[in-house]
Amino acid sequence: MKSRQKGKKKGSAKERVFGCDLQEHLQHSGQEVPQVLKSCAEFVEEYGVVDGIYRLSGVSSNIQKLRQEFESERKPDLRRDVYLQDIHCVSSLCKAYFRELPDPLLTYRLYDKFAEAVGVQLEPERLVKILEVLRELPVPNYRTLEFLMRHLVHMASFSAQTNMHARNLAIVWAPNLLRSKDIEASGFNGTAAFMEVRVQSIVVEFILTHVDQLFGGAALSGGEVESGWRSLPGTRASGSPEDLMPRPLPYHLPSILQAGDGPPQMRPYHTIIEIAEHKRKGSLKVRKWRSIFNLGRSGHETKRKLPRGAEDREDKSNKGTLRPAKSMDSLSAAAGASDEPEGLVGPSSPRPSPLLPESLENDSIEAAEGEQEPEAEALGGTNSEPGTPRAGRSAIRAGGSSRAERCAGVHISDPYNVNLPLHITSILSVPPNIISNVSLARLTRGLECPALQHRPSPASGPGPGPGLGPGPPDEKLEASPASSPLADSGPDDLAPALEDSLSQEVQDSFSFLEDSSSSEPEWVGAEDGEVAQAEAAGAAFSPGEDDPGMGYLEELLGVGPQVEEFSVEPPLDDLSLDEAQFVLAPSCCSLDSAGPRPEVEEENGEEVFLSAYDDLSPLLGPKPPIWKGSGSLEGEAAGCGRQALGQGGEEQACWEVGEDKQAEPGGRLDIREEAEGSPETKVEAGKASEDRGEAGGSQETKVRLREGSREETEAKEEKSKGQKKADSMEAKGVEEPGGDEYTDEKEKEIEREEDEQREEAQVEAGRDLEQGAQEDQVAEEKWEVVQKQEAEGVREDEDKGQREKGYHEARKDQGDGEDSRSPEAATEGGAGEVSKERESGDGEAEGDQRAGGYYLEEDTLSEGSGVASLEVDCAKEGNPHSSEMEEVAPQPPQPEEMEPEGQPSPDGCLCPCSLGLGGVGMRLASTLVQVQQVRSVPVVPPKPQFAKMPSAMCSKIHVAPANPCPRPGRLDGTPGERAWGSRASRSSWRNGGSLSFDAAVALARDRQRTEAQGVRRTQTCTEGGDYCLIPRTSPCSMISAHSPRPLSCLELPSEGAEGSGSRSRLSLPPREPQVPDPLLSSQRRSYAFETQANPGKGEGL
């Protein structure tokens, strides 16, 4: 600037316009006011009613061009397109002219006097003081000041369009009009610079708001000014101020306002604050990782993202110009809410502008703004309040809050997708809960996520639900109807259970807010139908919190376990895969194994399965038989399923029909409905069409479950028998997916027929649970010995081989055999029911113990799922078809799903045992298989934050990997079956990051709702068997929804209670824990979040 001035000085005085002394320039030009001011003011008044006028900087090249024209032509044509397109270059040039004056318009010598004048607290006195100081101004300066002030007042009248109120204009103009030589010499450092800014802003704003009082009604000529000044000292100083006092403009400064007044917030330059804020916003918002490198940018994008309307307006105005400042933000808040942003923005924009004077002007404006704001605040004037600083502060706050929110809820997905491995990315993106901010966002925004809310009703969207958003849940829904009937056949149930668990995991990630533990009780007490669904979905599961009615959705999604999983499993994510494995198991076990946990801990992996099963049994309610059924389930399954009640033939028939039914998903749904309708009808429907046969058996089981909710023992007997057969079948199926599975299917069909007959007979006989339990126990004990030996022999062989091979292989074998049944499993809805029951823990315990408990041991032994949890067994064997269904539906994930079941056996067990991975800590003993699950699910150890996250978030995290990295563990396994579509959905939803959390949830909800119809019977399944809270008076209604698993739950409990031959290692005591079902429910309510979430993970992940 100095160099420019020097260069100009070299030329003739006539040629110099900028940087020339004002008085000298006016003398040479013969004008009362500088031509630059007059031309620019006229142009701005005509064309400059735009946002951010005088605050935004024009294009530097245009400013320089216009500057040269003024110096050469004296009066250039400002109406050329170049200037009309860049109006701000004209306003910037006008400010630059005053900024470059050797002596400021208000002169250096009067700076102290102005500062003293504004220091007066009372407005009348201040007005007098200011008038006295203005009288000391040279006449050219006074005329020019009056012309400029009237122009600015006129422009302030358009503040609605320009967002430039009197305060904003004062802030941007003050540094150009009033400066302190001493402060400039000091380099604008220290408190003196801030004081200068205050004085500048306060003085200029005061003059702007009192133009009429200070300059009279009309402009005064030079002589008039002189005479007027001399004549007015008394009148104006005394009378005029007092008279005009009532007339202060809206921006009148409070009488108390002083140079030092105002909050320190005003002190910093608005420009500085705003710029810093923009930069921080850019990086903090985490719009992109490179945002860190965008600090140099104007920050328009960042501000645009900010919720502030002013910033948005700034962006718009800024778009037209190159200046980074946003014209939309006014420099001052209050009357000039936009003014404050202007102060902030204006200075920042000038600085970026190439025009040095402009940037200086902005800086001084910034300083002035700072002063004005403190002064205004001190005065407390409504208009003069530091609206500008407030606006800036508010903008900063908004930016900070928005950044935090966006980082947590919006932008997390991008970073994860970019930097993290696929499995971690998917996990992170699904619940953006890995980040602490994300956890906050999910606690706030996450609650909004439909997935969290819908998760309670997995029936509607097992896969597409919150976590299983992908399409597979839909498939699972379809499979679920058939699977429910197939629940009797272990293999099919097993896959669906895994799918359910996965969906539950996903939902848990969403519903971590709604503690599964607490919501699970809600499910129980919500409604019979809803509760039944809730139980089926996850008695221990907590969909009830969100919406009892969502139980069906939760069931399909296997939400219950997922939610629990998340609360307890956050450590899972934090832990390494191995660590997470252990964490999952305890989580699954802790909730469900309130009573049986010790057992589970004592037991081996298989025993853990049984223990988990036992835990589920308590959840299931007074179904100790389930434990016994679990224990003696294998023998009973073989013996009882085949011989007990002499329904083995029927059971086989049911199995065959079930297989056929698997082949025909449509039939499954129909049969499912039939099963819901009545046991006989369901059985007949299932038998009538062998395609639906399996579904018929399951449906009969469902009916039995309904009845079993009343006659749980009877239903459990039948179911346990059916499950025993299913176990035998599943064990065979596991070892020999082809032939043995078929035999098992036949056996199970016969068993189902027997169960149906038994169920009918028992229902007719009075539905005596004890009688049924005794009968089942007797039959189961008999068959426990017979079939247990057979099944266990096979199972142990299978378990050994499969465990060695890995639960995945066992599940794969089952999946192969189950694949043939996959239609069955899909038809059963057993996947949804089983997994949901597992998730619910109680429902699963009943359903799985009946149908799956039997399989449980086989699966645990043969598949090594016993290590994971009983409920996994239940899910696998209790709902082998469901599991198979899950495995079959997404055959590729089948091994994974099998493995999750095997390891945490989340399918069979919602109970922590099944999850042995990283549950509350109960099932840690359950182990290797579970560990495999977790490993298979890279448990996203990425951030310890996960541990802090609610279980829902963890489960969410785990679910995500299912899509990107199908794993045998619960993360991937469960969704695999049921979430072929759901996985895609989930992965896109989580990993894509493109889908907002809410959008993903909404998608999951839609899918869940679509699938809800098919899944409801699964919901009822858990209801009937699992919860004492759920009215068992309506077992039929419950069974209809959860037919496959309810049978397993009911029959299995009977068997478990009566005969724990195989379950002996699980020990019948778990059956006793079943008796304190309400207690376990309470426990689960508290831990359900963790426990069920873990099983869901084990299965799904």
UniProtKB/Swiss-Prot annotation:
Question: Which gene specifies this protein's sequence?
Answer: ARHGAP30
Entry's Gene Ontology cellular component terms? cytoplasmic vesicle; cytosol; intracellular membrane-bounded organelle
Q: Where is this site: Arginine finger?
A: R55
Q: What biological processes does GO assign it?
A: negative regulation of Rho protein signal transduction; regulation of small GTPase mediated signal transduction; small GTPase-mediated signal transduction
Q: Does the keyword S-adenosyl-L-methionine apply?
A: no
Please give the residue positions where the record annotates the modification Phosphoserine: S576, S996
User: Which portions of the sequence form the region Disordered?
Assistant: 224-243, 300-400, 451-529, 621-906, 965-991, 1050-1101
- Keywords of this protein's UniProt record, alphabetized? Cytoplasmic vesicle, GTPase activation, Phosphoprotein
| Places the protein is found | Cytoplasmic vesicle
Q: What is this protein called?
A: Rho GTPase-activating protein 30
Q: Which InterPro entries match?
A: PX-Rho_GAP, Rho_GTPase_activation_prot, RhoGAP_dom
The Rho-GAP domain extends over 20-215
Compositional bias of kind Pro residues: 459-472
Q: Where is the composition biased (Basic and acidic residues)?
A: 308-318, 658-694, 701-735, 759-770, 779-822
Decide whether keyword Phosphoprotein is in the record.
Answer: yes
UniProt main location, coarse: cytoplasm
Q: Which GO terms describe its molecular function?
A: GTPase activator activity
- For bias kind Acidic residues, which ranges apply? 360-376
Q: What organism is listed for this UniProt entry?
A: Homo sapiens
- Role played: GTPase-activating protein (GAP) for RAC1 and RHOA, but not for CDC42.
